[in-house]
From Swiss-Prot:
Transmembrane segments: none annotated. A monovalent cation. Ammonium or potassium. It catalyses: (R)-pantothenate + ATP = (R)-4'-phosphopantothenate + ADP + H(+). Substrate binds at Y100, G107, A108, D109, R110, T184. Homodimer. SUPFAM superfamilies: Actin-like ATPase domain (SSF53067). One of its GO terms (molecular function) is pantothenate kinase activity. CDD domains: ASKHA_NBD_PanK-III. Belongs to the type III pantothenate kinase family. This is Type III pantothenate kinase. Catalyzes the phosphorylation of pantothenate (Pan), the first step in CoA biosynthesis.
């Protein structure tokens, strides 16, 4: 079995593949203070619930935007799986030209998503990943990664509002019944939700005009399903895009 791990700033997503099939996947909180042993305890319990033991894991591939957590995961793999993981970063074979001024600056998750999306759809794409930050990445019809945009995530935007406007109550980020709200809670929700929908549509439309292209727009990430249905620009939602990208990169790099 192949263990794939995507370490994000807020959450870490873990997947277990049997061949090409994603058999299990879990989402846990990313904690920079956790040691490799602590992550191993969490993973052991998740595997136990699935009826899987560490000795069934044949290989591991990891993408991470959190260096301390990457070190902990690498320690976990060496100690409990018995091998060092493949790590998405400089030197890994992506099969995708990175047309960025400095390719080393591109987040591992952005490249993984781009690889997975192009492998599946084989056409020009914009990949929108709703995470701690929301990223917009353009891949042309030749499968070349051009770059994109990074915006504050929806939850970061909400937290900033609540932190700076002390009289406003903290509310759940959700789709409100109306844009013209009749109470403070719904007013906040309307501003956050529809404001973010407008941000997504606005950036995608500008990318289309700038590239003079009509790419397929694919959304992924924790909040993709919340936002995508209300936008006018997102065509597909693929919640496991990053995990699938890790599987593809593993196949391109294994000995």
């Amino acid at each position: 079995m192949l263990l794939v791990i995507d370490v994000g700033n807020t959450n870490t997503v873990v997947g277990l593949y049997e061949g090409q099939t994603l058999a299990y996947n879990w989402r846990i909180t990313t904690d920079k203070g956790r040691t490799g042993d602590e992550y191993a305890m969490l993973l052991h319990e998740l595997l136990r619930l699935a009826g899987v033991t560490f000795d069934r894991i044949e290989d591991v591939i990891v993408s991470s935007v959190v260096p301390p957590t990457l070190q902990a995961i690498e320690s976990l793999c060496r100690k409990y799986v018995g091998r060092s993981p493949y790590v998405v970063g400089p030197g890994i074979k992506t099969g995708m030209p990175i047309l960025y001024e400095n390719p080393r600056e591109v987040g591992a998750d952005r490249i993984v998503n781009a690889v997975a999306a192009f492998a599946r759809w084989q056409r020009s794409l914009i990949v929108v990943d709703f995470g701690t930050a929301t990223t917009f990445d353009y891949i042309n019809a030749k499968g070349q990664y051009h770059g994109g945009a990074i915006a504050p995530g929806l939850k970061i935007s909400a937290d900033a509002l609540f932190d700076k406007a002390s009289k406003l109550p903290r509310v759940e980020v959700s789709r409100p019944p109306t844009v013209v709200a009749k109470n403070t809670v719904n007013s906040i929700q309307a501003g956050l939700f529809y404001g973010y929908v407008g941000l997504v549509d606005g950036i995608v439309e500008r990318m289309r005009k700038e590239t003079r292209d009509d790419p397929l727009v694919v959304a992924t990430g924790g909040l993709a399903t919340l936002i995508a249905d209300e936008t006018q620009t997102i065509h597909e939602v693929e919640s496991d895009l990053t995990l699938e990208g890790l599987r593809i990169l593993y196949l391109r790099n294994k000995g």
